[in-house]
Amino acid sequence: MTEIYRTISTGRGDDVSPTKCRERRRRRIEMRRQAAVFGEPSSSRNRDRTDMEVYSSFDVPLRKQARRSEIGGLPADIGGFLAPPAASSCQKSEAPVWKGEETEDEPLYGIVSVMGRSRKMEDSVTVKPNLCKPEVNRQRPVHFFAVYDGHGGSQVSTLCSTTMHTFVKEELEQNLEEEEEGSENDVVERKWRGVMKRSFKRMDEMATSTCVCGTSVPLCNCDPREAAISGSTAVTAVLTHDHIIVANTGDSRAVLCRNGMAIPLSNDHKPDRPDERARIEAAGGRVLVVDGARVEGILATSRAIGDRYLKPMVAWEPEVTFMRRESGDECLVLASDGLWDVLSSQLACDIARFCLREETPSSLDLNRMAQEDDNDGEQNPSRSVLAATLLTRLALGRQSSDNISVVVIDLKNSSQ
């Protein structure tokens, strides 16, 4: 993945080269986008250049051309947005946001994934509507969503985005025979928990045995340290007609908005969490404070896929939440810590609810001012995309220093 680093100027400067002019023009365009989102007047284009460049200092190119024809398989383009999983996505398009297909079987969702201020893109996002129709769900479709936040490179997060949903599908399609003791709901819950844990275990085994080059570690001639230092968090959500199943390892997070209240469906795995610290120390490791609590002073999350050199202190095993859907469920937000480091769960839910309300016009064009310069005639985004976009931009405005990936699933207007 190409690395991009920009030195942001806070003054006019004397360089009037074409490159600098283009950079300033992009910043002016970004400032006008921000004005459209945060309600500032369009006259902001007449502000002093110094103030404008400071305000848009994150300078993220939000109108990257989408280069992926499917969701799942590769990380989002640097600073760009994932392309929609539709046949028309093969055509040239520069739409910065998109919406999930609005069929009777699929939930409505919006995705945004940007590099932000980080020097490289290590996040990956996967969306697989209608993943399969397993027996455990009475032959009805299940929908898969996931956010992966890589570290030590994007190798493991990319591998997760291409493989995890396949493992989940394979586990679901197996004949899940077991003694059906207890109520029907208890049996279904045990089966789902087993499916997710086995899928995560298989994913970790693949990640720790696969080199950066894609070859099995014992068979390649690469430096073994390259594969050993790469890892990824993983938060996955499987949506069915009756339930939401979330599995999480690491510090990416899933939050359900129910009747206006934020309900965490995952718990961040941080080394200073008492139970995680005890587990790490029992495995022979240490939690050192180096710019925050870290496993052996290195990794800021206590669980992850991969990270072979920190096993067994860094565990792969996910915590699984099995929750029945209710009529008050409004939306589900999955995001990497680039969002959660600067936004609380309740604030994220409040923003998503505002965007998903019926009275909120889905035709609100976040890029109206930018389209004055490069009009592409694209359709307006859905409310789910509006929510994901606004959350991302708010995180950028709050100086988030990491990649930011956000998935917003509309549970109120999706078919059940």
Curated annotation (Swiss-Prot):
PROSITE patterns the UniProt entry points to: PPM_1, PPM_2
Record-annotated disulphide pairs: none
Lineage top rank: taxon: Eukaryota
UniProt catalytic activity: O-phospho-L-seryl-[protein] + H2O = L-seryl-[protein] + phosphate; O-phospho-L-threonyl-[protein] + H2O = L-threonyl-[protein] + phosphate
Keywords in alphabetical order: Hydrolase, Magnesium, Manganese, Metal-binding, Protein phosphatase
GO biological process assignments: response to abscisic acid
Pfam families for this protein: PP2C
Name of the protein in question: Probable protein phosphatase 2C 75
